[in-house]
Protein backbone atom coordinates (compact mmCIF):
# COMPACT_ATOMS: atom_id res chain seq x y z
CA UNK A 1 0.00 0.00 0.00
CA UNK A 2 1.36 3.41 -0.82
CA UNK A 3 0.59 7.06 -1.04
CA UNK A 4 -0.65 7.98 -4.50
CA UNK A 5 2.35 9.22 -6.44
CA UNK A 6 4.61 6.26 -5.63
CA UNK A 7 3.50 3.32 -7.76
CA UNK A 8 4.19 0.57 -5.24
CA UNK A 9 1.55 -2.07 -4.56
CA UNK A 10 -2.02 -2.03 -5.72
CA UNK A 11 -3.82 0.16 -3.18
CA UNK A 12 -3.21 3.84 -3.62
CA UNK A 13 -4.31 7.11 -2.06
CA UNK A 14 -5.47 9.70 -4.54
CA UNK A 15 -2.83 12.32 -3.67
CA UNK A 16 -1.49 14.56 -6.40
CA UNK A 17 1.09 12.75 -8.47
CA UNK A 18 4.60 13.81 -7.55
CA UNK A 19 3.86 15.27 -4.13
CA UNK A 20 4.81 12.21 -2.11
CA UNK A 21 7.91 11.46 -4.15
CA UNK A 22 9.76 14.72 -3.72
CA UNK A 23 13.13 13.03 -3.60
CA UNK A 24 12.50 11.57 -7.03
CA UNK A 25 11.09 14.63 -8.74
CA UNK A 26 12.38 18.12 -9.25
CA UNK A 27 11.26 21.58 -10.20
CA UNK A 28 7.88 23.21 -10.13
CA UNK A 29 5.73 25.13 -12.57
CA UNK A 30 5.53 28.88 -12.40
CA UNK A 31 1.82 29.49 -11.91
CA UNK A 32 1.71 31.58 -8.74
CA UNK A 33 -0.61 33.54 -6.49
CA UNK A 34 0.24 35.76 -3.57
CA UNK A 35 -1.16 35.74 -0.03
CA UNK A 36 -0.69 37.89 3.04
CA UNK A 37 2.09 39.88 1.29
CA UNK A 38 4.63 37.30 2.44
CA UNK A 39 5.89 36.52 -1.02
CA UNK A 40 4.63 32.95 -1.09
CA UNK A 41 4.29 31.22 -4.42
CA UNK A 42 1.58 28.66 -5.04
CA UNK A 43 2.48 25.92 -7.48
CA UNK A 44 1.23 22.62 -8.82
CA UNK A 45 2.90 19.53 -7.33
CA UNK A 46 6.64 19.21 -7.80
CA UNK A 47 7.43 17.53 -11.08
CA UNK A 48 3.80 17.29 -12.11
CA UNK A 49 2.58 18.16 -15.57
CA UNK A 50 -0.41 20.46 -15.96
CA UNK A 51 -2.65 20.65 -18.99
CA UNK A 52 -5.26 23.23 -19.91
CA UNK A 53 -8.59 22.45 -21.56
CA UNK A 54 -7.43 23.80 -24.90
CA UNK A 55 -4.87 21.01 -25.01
CA UNK A 56 -7.07 18.16 -23.86
CA UNK A 57 -10.47 16.62 -23.68
CA UNK A 58 -11.46 17.89 -20.21
CA UNK A 59 -11.79 15.09 -17.68
CA UNK A 60 -10.83 13.82 -14.23
CA UNK A 61 -11.10 10.78 -16.32
CA UNK A 62 -14.36 11.22 -18.14
CA UNK A 63 -15.22 14.48 -16.35
CA UNK A 64 -16.16 17.97 -17.51
CA UNK A 65 -15.04 21.52 -16.74
CA UNK A 66 -16.82 23.35 -13.96
CA UNK A 67 -16.64 26.97 -12.84
CA UNK A 68 -15.89 28.26 -9.36
CA UNK A 69 -19.35 29.81 -9.19
CA UNK A 70 -20.89 26.34 -9.40
CA UNK A 71 -18.56 24.98 -6.70
CA UNK A 72 -17.79 27.93 -4.36
CA UNK A 73 -16.98 25.58 -1.47
CA UNK A 74 -14.09 23.94 -3.34
CA UNK A 75 -10.61 24.65 -1.95
CA UNK A 76 -7.04 23.52 -2.50
CA UNK A 77 -4.57 22.35 0.13
CA UNK A 78 -1.02 23.65 -0.28
CA UNK A 79 2.15 22.62 1.54
CA UNK A 80 5.61 24.17 1.84
CA UNK A 81 8.04 21.26 1.79
CA UNK A 82 11.39 23.07 1.75
CA UNK A 83 10.89 26.25 3.84
CA UNK A 84 11.47 28.28 0.68
CA UNK A 85 8.15 30.10 0.33
CA UNK A 86 6.96 27.69 -2.36
CA UNK A 87 3.60 26.12 -1.52
CA UNK A 88 2.68 23.10 -3.63
CA UNK A 89 -0.80 21.81 -4.35
CA UNK A 90 -1.42 18.49 -2.62
CA UNK A 91 -5.17 17.87 -2.35
CA UNK A 92 -8.65 19.23 -2.66
CA UNK A 93 -10.99 20.02 0.22
CA UNK A 94 -14.43 21.36 1.05
CA UNK A 95 -15.29 24.56 2.89
CA UNK A 96 -17.91 23.37 5.42
CA UNK A 97 -18.03 26.61 7.45
CA UNK A 98 -16.39 29.99 6.86
CA UNK A 99 -13.35 28.86 8.88
CA UNK A 100 -13.44 25.06 8.43
CA UNK A 101 -12.23 22.77 5.65
CA UNK A 102 -13.00 19.05 5.41
CA UNK A 103 -10.52 16.85 3.57
CA UNK A 104 -8.94 13.39 3.64
CA UNK A 105 -6.71 12.46 6.58
CA UNK A 106 -4.05 11.15 4.22
CA UNK A 107 -3.80 14.65 2.74
CA UNK A 108 -2.48 16.04 6.02
CA UNK A 109 -0.28 13.11 7.09
CA UNK A 110 2.85 11.48 5.73
CA UNK A 111 3.04 7.94 4.33
CA UNK A 112 3.34 6.55 7.87
CA UNK A 113 0.28 8.41 9.13
CA UNK A 114 2.21 11.06 11.06
CA UNK A 115 0.53 14.45 11.00
CA UNK A 116 2.16 17.04 8.76
CA UNK A 117 2.87 20.51 10.14
CA UNK A 118 -0.14 22.08 8.46
CA UNK A 119 -0.12 24.97 10.94
CA UNK A 120 3.46 25.97 10.22
CA UNK A 121 3.76 24.93 6.59
CA UNK A 122 0.26 24.45 5.22
CA UNK A 123 -2.19 26.80 3.55
CA UNK A 124 -5.64 26.72 1.99
CA UNK A 125 -6.40 28.41 -1.32
CA UNK A 126 -10.05 29.22 -2.06
CA UNK A 127 -12.01 31.32 -4.51
CA UNK A 128 -10.63 29.88 -7.73
CA UNK A 129 -11.24 26.98 -10.09
CA UNK A 130 -7.65 27.25 -11.36
CA UNK A 131 -4.99 24.91 -10.04
CA UNK A 132 -2.74 26.85 -7.63
CA UNK A 133 -4.57 30.03 -8.66
CA UNK A 134 -3.51 29.86 -12.31
CA UNK A 135 -1.38 32.41 -14.18
CA UNK A 136 -3.48 35.35 -12.95
CA UNK A 137 -2.96 34.64 -9.24
CA UNK A 138 -6.64 33.99 -8.55
CA UNK A 139 -8.09 33.17 -5.18
CA UNK A 140 -7.71 33.87 -1.48
CA UNK A 141 -5.13 32.07 0.63
CA UNK A 142 -5.35 31.64 4.40
CA UNK A 143 -3.32 29.85 7.02
CA UNK A 144 -4.30 26.88 9.17
CA UNK A 145 -4.47 26.91 12.97
CA UNK A 146 -5.59 23.36 13.80
CA UNK A 147 -6.01 19.88 12.34
CA UNK A 148 -8.53 17.38 13.68
CA UNK A 149 -8.85 13.70 12.81
CA UNK A 150 -12.30 12.14 13.22
CA UNK A 151 -11.41 8.67 14.41
CA UNK A 152 -7.99 7.05 14.45
CA UNK A 153 -6.57 7.32 10.96
CA UNK A 154 -4.96 4.07 9.76
CA UNK A 155 -2.43 4.92 7.08
CA UNK A 156 -1.85 1.30 6.05
CA UNK A 157 -5.54 0.58 5.54
CA UNK A 158 -6.46 4.16 4.54
CA UNK A 159 -9.25 3.85 7.10
CA UNK A 160 -10.97 6.71 8.94
CA UNK A 161 -9.69 8.90 6.12
CA UNK A 162 -11.19 12.23 7.15
CA UNK A 163 -9.77 15.41 8.69
CA UNK A 164 -11.02 18.88 9.53
CA UNK A 165 -8.84 21.98 9.29
CA UNK A 166 -9.48 25.21 11.16
CA UNK A 167 -8.49 28.31 9.21
CA UNK A 168 -6.71 31.37 10.59
CA UNK A 169 -9.32 33.64 9.01
CA UNK A 170 -12.87 33.07 7.79
CA UNK A 171 -13.54 32.90 4.07
CA UNK A 172 -16.48 34.64 2.44
CA UNK A 173 -17.36 31.82 0.04
CA UNK A 174 -20.48 29.68 0.37
CA UNK A 175 -19.85 26.54 2.45
CA UNK A 176 -21.26 23.09 1.73
CA UNK A 177 -22.94 20.88 4.31
CA UNK A 178 -21.83 17.33 5.13
CA UNK A 179 -24.32 14.47 5.08
CA UNK A 180 -25.82 13.97 8.53
CA UNK A 181 -25.26 10.99 10.78
CA UNK A 182 -27.87 8.36 10.00
CA UNK A 183 -28.51 9.64 6.47
CA UNK A 184 -29.29 6.60 4.34
CA UNK A 185 -31.33 8.13 1.52
CA UNK A 186 -28.32 9.72 -0.17
CA UNK A 187 -26.34 6.46 -0.11
CA UNK A 188 -28.72 4.20 -2.01
CA UNK A 189 -26.98 2.02 -4.64
CA UNK A 190 -27.50 3.40 -8.11
CA UNK A 191 -27.74 7.00 -6.93
CA UNK A 192 -25.70 9.26 -9.19
CA UNK A 193 -23.08 11.19 -7.23
CA UNK A 194 -20.92 14.10 -8.39
CA UNK A 195 -17.21 14.32 -7.56
CA UNK A 196 -14.85 17.27 -8.10
CA UNK A 197 -11.09 17.65 -8.40
CA UNK A 198 -7.94 18.82 -10.15
CA UNK A 199 -6.53 15.32 -10.52
CA UNK A 200 -4.72 13.53 -13.31
CA UNK A 201 -6.54 13.45 -16.62
CA UNK A 202 -5.13 10.09 -17.60
CA UNK A 203 -4.09 6.88 -15.91
CA UNK A 204 -0.43 6.69 -16.95
CA UNK A 205 1.85 7.37 -13.97
CA UNK A 206 4.56 9.04 -16.04
CA UNK A 207 2.75 10.93 -18.73
CA UNK A 208 -0.69 11.93 -17.46
CA UNK A 209 -1.02 15.62 -16.48
CA UNK A 210 -3.12 17.28 -13.82
CA UNK A 211 -5.95 19.53 -14.91
CA UNK A 212 -5.32 23.26 -14.61
CA UNK A 213 -9.03 23.84 -13.98
CA UNK A 214 -11.61 22.21 -11.72
CA UNK A 215 -13.39 19.19 -13.17
CA UNK A 216 -16.49 17.27 -12.16
CA UNK A 217 -17.48 13.66 -12.64
CA UNK A 218 -20.74 11.78 -12.21
CA UNK A 219 -20.63 8.18 -10.99
CA UNK A 220 -23.25 5.72 -9.71
CA UNK A 221 -22.94 4.56 -6.11
CA UNK A 222 -22.44 0.84 -5.52
CA UNK A 223 -23.69 -1.38 -2.72
CA UNK A 224 -21.35 -2.41 0.09
CA UNK A 225 -21.47 -5.99 -1.18
CA UNK A 226 -20.40 -4.89 -4.66
CA UNK A 227 -17.67 -2.65 -3.25
CA UNK A 228 -16.23 -5.34 -1.00
CA UNK A 229 -16.13 -7.95 -3.71
CA UNK A 230 -14.73 -5.57 -6.33
CA UNK A 231 -12.10 -3.71 -4.32
CA UNK A 232 -10.91 -6.53 -2.06
CA UNK A 233 -10.32 -8.61 -5.18
CA UNK A 234 -8.70 -5.77 -7.11
CA UNK A 235 -6.09 -5.03 -4.43
CA UNK A 236 -5.87 -8.66 -3.22
CA UNK A 237 -6.46 -7.58 0.39
CA UNK A 238 -9.44 -9.15 2.19
CA UNK A 239 -11.26 -6.44 4.13
CA UNK A 240 -9.59 -3.57 2.26
CA UNK A 241 -13.02 -2.08 1.69
CA UNK A 242 -14.65 -1.31 5.04
CA UNK A 243 -18.45 -0.96 4.99
CA UNK A 244 -19.65 1.90 7.15
CA UNK A 245 -16.34 3.73 6.89
CA UNK A 246 -16.20 3.76 3.09
CA UNK A 247 -18.41 3.90 0.03
CA UNK A 248 -17.51 3.21 -3.56
CA UNK A 249 -18.72 4.38 -6.93
CA UNK A 250 -18.07 4.04 -10.63
CA UNK A 251 -19.04 2.33 -13.84
CA UNK A 252 -16.02 0.10 -13.47
CA UNK A 253 -12.67 1.14 -14.85
CA UNK A 254 -12.28 0.56 -18.55
CA UNK A 255 -8.50 0.64 -18.77
CA UNK A 256 -9.00 3.14 -21.59
CA UNK A 257 -8.86 6.85 -20.76
CA UNK A 258 -11.11 7.80 -23.66
CA UNK A 259 -13.98 5.71 -22.34
CA UNK A 260 -13.34 5.57 -18.58
CA UNK A 261 -14.87 7.60 -15.75
CA UNK A 262 -12.75 7.63 -12.61
CA UNK A 263 -11.09 9.76 -9.97
CA UNK A 264 -7.31 9.81 -10.07
CA UNK A 265 -4.22 11.11 -8.21
CA UNK A 266 -4.73 14.78 -7.43
CA UNK A 267 -8.40 14.31 -6.54
CA UNK A 268 -7.70 13.26 -2.93
CA UNK A 269 -9.64 15.13 -0.26
CA UNK A 270 -12.17 16.48 -2.75
CA UNK A 271 -15.90 16.07 -2.14
CA UNK A 272 -18.55 13.77 -3.54
CA UNK A 273 -22.08 15.24 -3.56
CA UNK A 274 -25.59 13.84 -3.62
CA UNK A 275 -28.62 16.14 -3.37
CA UNK A 276 -26.58 19.13 -2.21
CA UNK A 277 -24.69 17.39 0.62
CA UNK A 278 -21.15 16.06 0.84
CA UNK A 279 -21.53 12.29 1.19
CA UNK A 280 -17.95 11.26 0.43
CA UNK A 281 -14.32 12.31 0.33
CA UNK A 282 -12.07 11.01 -2.45
CA UNK A 283 -9.80 8.50 -0.74
CA UNK A 284 -8.24 5.59 -2.66
CA UNK A 285 -8.46 3.18 -5.54
CA UNK A 286 -6.66 0.25 -7.16
CA UNK A 287 -3.43 0.96 -9.03
CA UNK A 288 -0.64 -0.92 -10.78
CA UNK A 289 2.99 -0.18 -11.52
CA UNK A 290 1.89 1.47 -14.76
CA UNK A 291 -1.69 2.62 -14.20
CA UNK A 292 -2.56 5.19 -11.54
CA UNK A 293 -6.34 4.76 -11.83
CA UNK A 294 -9.12 3.54 -14.14
CA UNK A 295 -7.97 -0.06 -13.70
CA UNK A 296 -10.11 -2.42 -15.76
CA UNK A 297 -13.35 -3.29 -13.95
CA UNK A 298 -12.59 -1.51 -10.66
CA UNK A 299 -14.43 1.11 -8.61
CA UNK A 300 -13.16 4.14 -6.65
CA UNK A 301 -13.32 4.34 -2.84
CA UNK A 302 -14.49 7.34 -0.79
CA UNK A 303 -14.74 8.08 2.92
CA UNK A 304 -18.36 7.82 4.08
CA UNK A 305 -18.94 11.28 5.56
CA UNK A 306 -22.24 10.54 7.35
CA UNK A 307 -20.50 8.01 9.60
CA UNK A 308 -18.18 10.70 10.92
CA UNK A 309 -20.65 13.58 11.06
CA UNK A 310 -21.31 13.28 14.79
CA UNK A 311 -17.55 13.55 15.40
CA UNK A 312 -16.80 16.42 13.04
CA UNK A 313 -19.88 18.55 13.73
CA UNK A 314 -18.71 19.57 17.24
CA UNK A 315 -15.41 20.61 15.63
CA UNK A 316 -17.15 22.60 12.90
CA UNK A 317 -18.94 24.60 15.61
CA UNK A 318 -16.22 24.82 18.28
CA UNK A 319 -15.52 28.54 18.44
CA UNK A 320 -14.27 29.83 21.79
CA UNK A 321 -12.74 33.02 23.13
CA UNK A 322 -9.30 31.41 23.20
CA UNK A 323 -9.79 30.06 19.65
CA UNK A 324 -8.87 26.52 20.61
CA UNK A 325 -11.30 23.58 20.55
CA UNK A 326 -12.44 23.93 24.18
CA UNK A 327 -15.44 26.04 25.24
CA UNK A 328 -14.70 28.90 27.65
CA UNK A 329 -16.88 30.83 30.08
CA UNK A 330 -18.06 34.44 30.08
CA UNK A 331 -19.16 36.06 33.33
CA UNK A 332 -19.64 39.41 34.99
CA UNK A 333 -20.03 40.58 38.55
CA UNK A 334 -22.67 43.10 39.61
CA UNK A 335 -20.51 45.78 38.01
CA UNK A 336 -20.03 46.51 34.33
CA UNK A 337 -16.90 44.45 33.69
CA UNK A 338 -17.13 41.19 31.81
CA UNK A 339 -14.59 38.40 32.17
CA UNK A 340 -13.56 35.35 30.20
CA UNK A 341 -12.26 32.20 31.85
CA UNK A 342 -10.54 29.94 29.34
CA UNK A 343 -10.90 26.20 29.67
CA UNK A 344 -7.75 24.11 30.11
CA UNK A 345 -9.68 20.85 29.90
CA UNK A 346 -10.97 20.15 33.40
CA UNK A 347 -10.07 23.49 34.94
CA UNK A 348 -10.36 27.19 34.19
CA UNK A 349 -7.51 29.62 33.65
CA UNK A 350 -7.42 32.89 35.58
CA UNK A 351 -10.10 35.31 34.50
CA UNK A 352 -9.34 38.06 32.01
CA UNK A 353 -11.23 41.31 31.67
CA UNK A 354 -13.27 41.44 28.47
CA UNK A 355 -13.52 44.73 26.62
CA UNK A 356 -16.81 46.60 26.95
CA UNK A 357 -19.45 47.43 29.53
CA UNK A 358 -22.09 44.82 30.39
CA UNK A 359 -24.10 46.29 33.27
CA UNK A 360 -27.03 47.05 30.93
CA UNK A 361 -27.68 43.36 30.25
CA UNK A 362 -29.51 40.83 32.40
CA UNK A 363 -28.78 37.85 30.16
CA UNK A 364 -25.62 37.06 28.20
CA UNK A 365 -24.89 33.84 26.30
CA UNK A 366 -22.09 33.00 23.93
CA UNK A 367 -22.23 31.57 20.42
CA UNK A 368 -20.63 31.99 17.00
CA UNK A 369 -23.69 33.14 15.12
CA UNK A 370 -21.94 33.72 11.79
CA UNK A 371 -19.51 30.80 12.13
CA UNK A 372 -16.46 32.97 11.46
CA UNK A 373 -14.31 31.52 14.24
CA UNK A 374 -14.72 34.52 16.56
CA UNK A 375 -16.95 34.08 19.59
CA UNK A 376 -20.02 36.32 19.78
CA UNK A 377 -22.33 37.30 22.61
CA UNK A 378 -26.12 37.41 22.61
CA UNK A 379 -27.15 39.99 25.23
CA UNK A 380 -30.57 41.17 26.44
CA UNK A 381 -30.89 44.75 27.65
CA UNK A 382 -32.58 44.94 31.05
CA UNK A 383 -34.51 48.17 30.50
CA UNK A 384 -36.06 47.43 27.10
CA UNK A 385 -35.78 43.69 26.57
CA UNK A 386 -34.04 44.35 23.27
CA UNK A 387 -31.59 41.62 22.27
CA UNK A 388 -28.23 42.42 20.70
CA UNK A 389 -25.64 40.46 18.79
CA UNK A 390 -22.16 41.53 19.92
CA UNK A 391 -19.64 40.42 17.34
CA UNK A 392 -16.19 41.17 15.98
CA UNK A 393 -14.42 40.39 12.72
CA UNK A 394 -11.09 39.13 11.45
CA UNK A 395 -9.99 42.68 10.70
CA UNK A 396 -11.03 44.27 14.00
CA UNK A 397 -11.03 43.16 17.63
CA UNK A 398 -13.69 45.76 18.47
CA UNK A 399 -17.11 44.27 19.05
CA UNK A 400 -19.97 45.71 16.99
CA UNK A 401 -23.47 45.87 18.46
CA UNK A 402 -26.39 44.79 16.28
CA UNK A 403 -29.99 44.67 17.49
CA UNK A 404 -31.55 41.37 16.46
CA UNK A 405 -34.80 41.29 18.48
CA UNK A 406 -36.95 43.91 20.21
CA UNK A 407 -39.14 43.83 23.30
CA UNK A 408 -38.08 40.48 24.73
CA UNK A 409 -38.41 41.65 28.32
CA UNK A 410 -40.93 38.93 29.22
CA UNK A 411 -39.19 36.12 27.35
CA UNK A 412 -38.48 33.35 29.85
CA UNK A 413 -35.34 31.95 28.23
CA UNK A 414 -33.03 32.67 25.31
CA UNK A 415 -30.87 29.85 23.99
CA UNK A 416 -28.16 29.63 21.32
CA UNK A 417 -27.93 25.85 20.81
CA UNK A 418 -26.19 25.99 17.44
CA UNK A 419 -27.77 24.66 14.26
CA UNK A 420 -31.10 23.00 15.06
CA UNK A 421 -32.61 22.76 11.56
CA UNK A 422 -29.60 21.19 9.83
CA UNK A 423 -28.77 24.06 7.48
CA UNK A 424 -25.31 24.80 8.87
CA UNK A 425 -26.20 28.08 10.57
CA UNK A 426 -26.50 28.74 14.29
CA UNK A 427 -30.06 29.48 15.40
CA UNK A 428 -31.69 31.24 18.35
CA UNK A 429 -34.47 29.83 20.55
CA UNK A 430 -36.81 31.69 22.88
CA UNK A 431 -39.39 30.57 25.43
CA UNK A 432 -42.25 33.06 25.49
CA UNK A 433 -44.08 34.22 28.60
CA UNK A 434 -46.81 31.66 27.84
CA UNK A 435 -44.35 28.79 27.42
CA UNK A 436 -44.11 28.50 23.64
CA UNK A 437 -40.72 27.35 22.37
CA UNK A 438 -39.91 29.47 19.32
CA UNK A 439 -37.11 28.75 16.86
CA UNK A 440 -35.60 31.68 14.97
CA UNK A 441 -33.73 30.17 11.99
CA UNK A 442 -30.60 32.17 11.33
CA UNK A 443 -29.22 33.36 8.02
CA UNK A 444 -25.80 33.52 9.68
CA UNK A 445 -25.49 37.30 9.37
CA UNK A 446 -27.56 38.62 12.27
CA UNK A 447 -30.83 38.24 10.38
CA UNK A 448 -33.44 35.55 10.90
CA UNK A 449 -36.19 33.79 9.02
CA UNK A 450 -39.76 33.68 10.28
CA UNK A 451 -40.00 32.11 13.73
CA UNK A 452 -41.33 28.56 14.02
CA UNK A 453 -43.25 27.32 17.06
CA UNK A 454 -41.44 24.13 18.02
CA UNK A 455 -43.31 23.19 21.21
CA UNK A 456 -45.67 24.41 23.90
CA UNK A 457 -45.79 23.99 27.66
CA UNK A 458 -42.23 25.10 28.35
CA UNK A 459 -43.41 27.43 31.12
CA UNK A 460 -42.99 24.49 33.52
CA UNK A 461 -39.21 24.70 33.13
CA UNK A 462 -37.30 27.24 35.20
CA UNK A 463 -34.11 26.82 33.19
CA UNK A 464 -33.80 26.05 29.46
CA UNK A 465 -30.25 25.56 28.21
CA UNK A 466 -28.33 24.04 25.36
CA UNK A 467 -25.34 24.34 23.11
CA UNK A 468 -24.33 21.38 20.99
CA UNK A 469 -25.01 17.67 20.94
CA UNK A 470 -25.45 15.84 24.27
CA UNK A 471 -26.43 12.48 22.75
CA UNK A 472 -23.68 11.98 20.16
CA UNK A 473 -25.99 11.70 17.18
CA UNK A 474 -24.93 14.88 15.39
CA UNK A 475 -28.04 16.85 16.38
CA UNK A 476 -28.15 19.69 18.90
CA UNK A 477 -30.21 19.12 22.03
CA UNK A 478 -31.77 21.05 24.93
CA UNK A 479 -31.50 20.61 28.70
CA UNK A 480 -34.49 21.66 30.80
CA UNK A 481 -34.94 21.90 34.56
CA UNK A 482 -38.51 21.57 35.73
CA UNK A 483 -39.83 23.93 38.36
CA UNK A 484 -41.09 22.42 41.58
CA UNK A 485 -39.25 19.10 41.32
CA UNK A 486 -35.99 20.50 39.87
CA UNK A 487 -35.71 17.35 37.76
CA UNK A 488 -33.48 17.60 34.67
CA UNK A 489 -34.97 16.79 31.27
CA UNK A 490 -33.41 16.21 27.86
CA UNK A 491 -35.10 17.31 24.62
CA UNK A 492 -33.25 15.47 21.88
CA UNK A 493 -32.71 17.29 18.61
CA UNK A 494 -34.18 15.90 15.41
CA UNK A 495 -32.50 18.13 12.83
CA UNK A 496 -35.93 18.88 11.33
CA UNK A 497 -36.98 22.46 10.71
CA UNK A 498 -40.65 21.99 11.65
CA UNK A 499 -40.18 19.85 14.77
CA UNK A 500 -36.55 20.26 15.84
CA UNK A 501 -36.90 18.58 19.27
CA UNK A 502 -38.42 15.42 20.66
CA UNK A 503 -40.65 15.36 23.72
CA UNK A 504 -38.45 15.97 26.79
CA UNK A 505 -37.51 12.93 28.89
CA UNK A 506 -36.24 12.98 32.48
CA UNK A 507 -32.55 12.14 32.84
CA UNK A 508 -31.79 13.28 36.41
CA UNK A 509 -33.90 13.82 39.54
CA UNK A 510 -33.93 16.69 42.04
CA UNK A 511 -31.22 19.06 40.91
CA UNK A 512 -32.12 21.62 43.56
CA UNK A 513 -28.49 21.68 44.72
CA UNK A 514 -27.72 23.79 41.62
CA UNK A 515 -29.08 27.30 41.16
CA UNK A 516 -27.61 27.90 37.70
CA UNK A 517 -26.97 25.70 34.67
CA UNK A 518 -24.66 26.88 31.87
CA UNK A 519 -24.07 25.20 28.50
CA UNK A 520 -21.04 26.80 26.81
CA UNK A 521 -20.33 23.75 24.62
CA UNK A 522 -17.50 21.23 24.74
CA UNK A 523 -15.46 22.38 27.74
CA UNK A 524 -12.98 19.51 27.99
CA UNK A 525 -12.38 19.11 24.25
CA UNK A 526 -13.62 15.56 23.67
CA UNK A 527 -16.20 16.54 21.00
CA UNK A 528 -19.14 16.04 23.38
CA UNK A 529 -21.14 18.91 24.87
CA UNK A 530 -20.74 19.50 28.59
CA UNK A 531 -22.66 21.21 31.37
CA UNK A 532 -21.35 23.74 33.88
CA UNK A 533 -23.41 24.04 37.06
CA UNK A 534 -23.24 26.41 40.03
CA UNK A 535 -24.29 25.11 43.42
CA UNK A 536 -26.34 27.09 45.91
CA UNK A 537 -23.12 27.53 47.94
CA UNK A 538 -21.32 29.15 44.98
CA UNK A 539 -19.18 26.21 43.90
CA UNK A 540 -18.82 25.76 40.14
CA UNK A 541 -18.74 22.27 38.64
CA UNK A 542 -18.03 20.70 35.26
CA UNK A 543 -20.26 17.78 34.30
CA UNK A 544 -18.64 16.19 31.28
CA UNK A 545 -21.01 14.90 28.64
CA UNK A 546 -20.92 11.18 27.89
CA UNK A 547 -22.98 11.22 24.70
CA UNK A 548 -25.71 9.10 26.32
CA UNK A 549 -29.29 10.32 26.40
CA UNK A 550 -30.04 8.55 29.69
CA UNK A 551 -29.39 9.08 33.39
CA UNK A 552 -25.73 8.48 32.46
CA UNK A 553 -25.72 11.67 30.38
CA UNK A 554 -22.94 13.20 32.54
CA UNK A 555 -19.82 11.89 34.21
CA UNK A 556 -19.03 12.58 37.87
CA UNK A 557 -18.81 16.31 38.48
CA UNK A 558 -15.43 18.05 38.70
CA UNK A 559 -15.09 21.22 40.78
CA UNK A 560 -13.92 24.22 38.76
CA UNK A 561 -13.88 26.82 41.51
CA UNK A 562 -15.54 28.46 44.48
CA UNK A 563 -17.07 31.88 45.13
CA UNK A 564 -19.11 31.96 41.94
CA UNK A 565 -22.15 33.44 43.67
CA UNK A 566 -20.40 36.78 43.18
CA UNK A 567 -21.06 36.58 39.43
CA UNK A 568 -24.33 38.05 38.23
CA UNK A 569 -24.29 36.56 34.73
CA UNK A 570 -22.53 33.41 33.52
CA UNK A 571 -22.78 32.26 29.94
State each model region's role.
Residues 78-80, 101-104, 109-152:
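Conserved H-D interstitial segment of serine endopeptidase catalytic domains
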Residues 130-133, 141-143, 156-255:
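Chymotrypsin/trypsin-fold serine protease catalytic domain
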Residues 80-82, 106-109, 127-132, 168-173, ...:
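Acidic glycine-/aspartate-rich tracts in secreted/extracellular proteins
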Residues 72-76, 90-92, 247, 263, ...:
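Structural detector of coil-to-beta-strand junctions
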Residues 32-39, 95-108, 210, 215-224, ...:
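C-terminal subregion of chymotrypsin/trypsin-like serine protease catalytic domains
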Residues 2-97, 102, 116, 292-295, ...:
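Protease-domain processing segments flanking chymotrypsin-fold serine proteases, especially trypsin-like
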Residues 317-571:
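Trp/Gly-enriched beta-strand/coil motifs that build multi-repeat beta-propeller-like domains
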Residues 66-70, 95-96, 116-118, 155-159, ...:
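Extracellular/periplasmic catalytic domains that process cell-envelope and extracellular macromolecules
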Amino acid sequence: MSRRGIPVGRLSRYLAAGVAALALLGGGLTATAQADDRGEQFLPPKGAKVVSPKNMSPKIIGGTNTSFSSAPWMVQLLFEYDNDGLFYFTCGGTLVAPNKVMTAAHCVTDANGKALDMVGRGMVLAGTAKLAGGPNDEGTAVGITRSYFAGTYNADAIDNDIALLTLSKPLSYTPAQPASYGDTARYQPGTVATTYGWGMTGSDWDFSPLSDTLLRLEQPLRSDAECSENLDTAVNVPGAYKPGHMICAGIGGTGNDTTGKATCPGDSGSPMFVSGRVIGITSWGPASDFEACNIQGTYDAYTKVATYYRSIQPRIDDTSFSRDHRADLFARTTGATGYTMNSTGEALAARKAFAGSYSAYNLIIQTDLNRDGYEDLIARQSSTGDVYWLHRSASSSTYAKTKIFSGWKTVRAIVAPGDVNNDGKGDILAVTSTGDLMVYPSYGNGKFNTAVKAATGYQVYNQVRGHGDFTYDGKNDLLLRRGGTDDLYLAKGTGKSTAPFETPVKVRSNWSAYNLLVTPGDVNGDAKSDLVARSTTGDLYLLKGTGQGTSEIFATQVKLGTGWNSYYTIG
